Amino acid sequence: MNILLICGSPRKQGNTAQILRQLSIALEGETVTMVSLAELHLNGCLGCSVCQSDLEKPGCVQQDDITALLQQVMEADAVVYGTPLYGHSYSGQLKLFMDRHVALFK
């Protein structure tokens, strides 16, 4: 099984990252990849809908790390999102990434 762990914390070595690392250990024997959104260059969604023009693959006019990350999401059998709670909600980093998921919805 191919499992993608996405760490939505702005702190690369914070509690969320530690929890996801423990999960990775518990999933020994599976193919596990962990991605820290804090280490990626991701811009906010422009709402231009260009990503909806190609039905075969996700695309975006922005030149950032989203294309590679969305490819990992599509190839994964399971995706686990980890985030700290700030202001009774998930982190801004995870919100930004979730907004960019629109490229997957055709």
Go through each PLM region and give its residues.
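N-terminal beta1-alpha1-beta2 submodule of the flavodoxin-like/Rossmannoid cofactor-binding fold
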Residues: 1-104
